[in-house]
A protein has these predicted regions:
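The feature marks cytosolic C-terminal regulatory regions of anion transporters and related permeases
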Residues: 337-492
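Transmembrane helical cores of multi-pass ion-transport proteins
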Residues: 1-380, 384, 392-393
């Protein structure tokens, strides 16, 4: 990700360390893992070029972190509550499909695209599907052997009860290192591009030289502030989406505090910018691997950052022997678990209003990128939510009372402006010479436009031989009634 962003390679590792140690310490999410985000690579690459230096860009990252802290204090995390469930499910399934499609080339030894890329259009000008076709012409048999053996371990090892205490993913990495060393100087040897690449530090002075610090003299540069606002908004949205998604796959169904998460991410980004790292987010792929590997608390995210730091300091040469094919096998299994056929069947059974936003999100994310795809899915999801609300603004019942129809219309708890058209059409279509009862006994709030329609209907009904009775509907409703109701529920819970 650092390479694709045009940043120093060390910046990516540093961001992962800070995401693990700093963010996990503050975050209230038990399973999310933070680090450099593939979704920000285009923004970062363009920002470094437009600002003229990496040091100036780091200042924008620091400011973005401060802005995120303010967003958390202002409780902007509440917007996560408005992400439709079908869209979040679609995002998870799409990430699973992307993992499978993107990791197949790495599994066969074709590593032209950087590890972690989730966009349909790749930096090397290929797309997800053309890269798959290209990989068929560039198969490395050493990588294929490693990935097949790794997949078999990932599938069958957890079923061996006596040995399952050792995580399959750890075994896959060890096997990959051993085989990459065995294959050296043979026809199956892996090229450097097919292995993990991290900076090797030879001394304390070399290690300290890797850190880059922000240029605070550019604090008055408006372009720096523009980049800072862009990173803060995009990173916050991506984080909130990830938090919602991780809560869905949490076996214990815990709910993460979103405002606290924004503060944690802000502190993380501020720290990352001060030390020379990249902007970070909570990352769904790393978080999903955490869940699938048996992580239960945020200690796993913290330790991931801690071990990453120790590995960088003491065994970087060993990490550089890990084949990307081994990591591809782990991510292929993660992708399969996120995009199981059973999920598609479940969403289909849930009805059209759930399945259409779900499948649109899946397709949009796969064929664009995470943020654009989710934004498109959100539009479809919100359309179906509004459509459902319009239809469910009242209960309609016709009873017989002698020769006349008695029509009872019972209004919902919340009747907003959006329900105006549906209620108006219903009232206009009522048969003449009926007795109509409009009951608002369950309503905490009725929009004034809807009240006007009801009173106008009663005023004009006499000319049509219709008798209208209005029950438990006030002349005015205050929005605070709804707030009061919500507060009461929270107190009860």
């Amino acid at each position: 990700i650092a390479l694709a962003s045009g940043a120093p390679l060390f910046a990516g590792i540093l961001t992962g360390v800070i995401g693990g140690i700093v963010v996990a310490s503050i975050s209230g999410s038990q399973l999310s893992v933070s680090g450099p985000a593939a979704g920000l690579t285009v923004i970062v690459f363009g920002a470094i070029a437009s600002l003229g230096s990496y040091e100036t860009f780091l200042l924008a990252v620091v400011l973005a972190g401060i802005l995120q802290i303010f967003l958390g204090i202002l409780k902007a995390g509440i917007i996560a509550n408005y992400f439709p469930s079908s869209v979040i499910e679609g995002m998870l399934a799409a990430i699973g499909i992307i993992l499978i499609l993107k990791q197949i080339p790495h599994a066969v030894g074709f590593d032209s695209d950087f590890e972690g890329d989730q966009s349909f259009i790749q930096p090397n000008h290929e797309n997800t599907f053309s890269a798959l076709l290209s990989s068929l012409d560039m198969i490395s048999y050493g990588a294929v052997i490693i990935s097949i053996l790794s997949l078999l371990i990932m599938i069958y090892w957890p079923g061996i009860k006596k040995l399952s205490a050792i995580p399959a993913a750890i075994l896959v990495v060890i096997l990959g290192i051993v085989l990459s060393m065995v294959f050296q100087n043979t026809a199956l040897a892996l090229s450097p591009e097919q292995l993990v690449t991290i900076p090797v530090v030879g001394s304390y002075n070399e290690f300290m030289a890797l850190f880059v610090f922000p240029d605070f003299t550019q604090i008055g540069n408006k372009d720096v502030w523009t980049v800072a606002f862009t990173i803060a908004i995009v990173a916050s949205i991506e984080t909130l989406l990830c938090i919602e998604a991780v809560d869905k796959v949490d076996p214990y169904k815990r709910v993460s505090p979103t405002n606290r998460e924004l503060v944690a991410q802000g502190v993380g980004n501020m720290t990352s910018g001060l030390l020379g790292g990249l902007p970070m987010t909570s990352v769904i792929v790393r978080s999903s691997v955490n869940v699938n590997s048996g992580g239960k608390t945020k200690m796993s995210a913290f330790l991931h950052g801690f071990w990453l730091l120790l590995s960088l300091l003491f065994i970087p040469f060993l990490l550089n022997k890990i084949p990307l094919a081994s990591l591809a096998a782990i991510l292929l299994i993660t992708g399969y678990k996120l995009a199981k056929l059973s999920l598609f069947k479940k969403m289909w059974r849930n009805g059209r209003d759930q399945f259409i936003p779900f499948i649109v999100t899946v397709l949009a994310v796969v064929f664009t990128d995470l943020l654009k795809g989710v934004a498109f899915g959100m539009m479809i999801g919100i359309f179906y939510i509004l459509r459902t609300n319009l239809r469910n603004s009242y209960f309609y019942k016709i009873e017989k009372n002698g020769e006349k129809n008695v029509i009872r219309i019972k209004l919902a708890q919340e009747v907003s402006f959006l329900n105006k058209a549906a209620i108006q059409q219903t009232l206009l279509k009522l048969p003449k010479e009926s007795n109509v009862i409009i009951d608002g006994s369950d309503s905490l709030f009725i929009d004034k436009d809807v009240l006007e329609i009801i009173h106008n209907f009663k005023h004009n009904a006499f000319s049509k031989g219709t008798i209208v009775e209005i029950l438990n509907i006030r002349d005015h409703y205050d929005v605070s009634n709804t707030k009061e109701f919500v507060l009461k529920i929270e107190k009860i819970n």
